[in-house]
């Protein structure tokens, strides 16, 4: 079963996957899905932009 429907059922927030998502619920709104994805992309690309990795 997908996480979105389970989280919607648990929290009562309709279509939670289109809103704050599980990240927002688990962190009480301290982190957003967007901020977490942004950090993940920056970390994934850092070896290509930092000489220390060469």
From Swiss-Prot:
GO function terms (MF aspect): ITPase activity; metal ion binding; nucleotide binding; ribonucleoside triphosphate phosphatase activity
Subunit relationships: Homodimer.
InterPro entries: ITPase-like_fam, NTPase/PRRC1, YjjX_NTPase
A UniProt-annotated Pfam family: NTPase_I-T
Name of the protein in question: Inosine/xanthosine triphosphatase
Record flagged with keyword Isomerase: no
Reaction it catalyzes: XTP + H2O = XDP + phosphate + H(+); ITP + H2O = IDP + phosphate + H(+)
An example Gene Ontology biological process: nucleotide metabolic process
Cofactor, how bound (note): Binds 1 divalent metal cation per subunit; can use either Mg(2+) or Mn(2+).
Lineage: Bacteria, Pseudomonadati, Pseudomonadota, Gammaproteobacteria, Enterobacterales
Source species: Klebsiella aerogenes (Enterobacter aerogenes)
EC identifiers of the protein: 3.6.1.73
Record-stated family: Belongs to the YjjX NTPase family.
Chain's role: Phosphatase that hydrolyzes non-canonical purine nucleotides such as XTP and ITP to their respective diphosphate derivatives. Probably excludes non-canonical purines from DNA/RNA precursor pool, thus preventing their incorporation into DNA/RNA and avoiding chromosomal lesions.
Disulfide bond annotation, renumbered to this chain: none
Keywords of this entry: Hydrolase, Magnesium, Manganese, Metal-binding, Nucleotide metabolism, Nucleotide-binding
Keyword Iron: no
Enzyme class: hydrolase
Cofactor(s) this protein requires: Mg(2+); Mn(2+)
């Amino acid at each position: 079963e997908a996480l979105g429907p389970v989280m919607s059922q648990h929290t009562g927030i309709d279509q939670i996957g289109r809103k704050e998502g599980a990240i927002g619920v688990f962190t009480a709104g301290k982190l957003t899905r967007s901020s977490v994805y942004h950090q993940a992309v920056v970390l994934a690309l850092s070896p290509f932009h930092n000489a220390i990795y060469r």
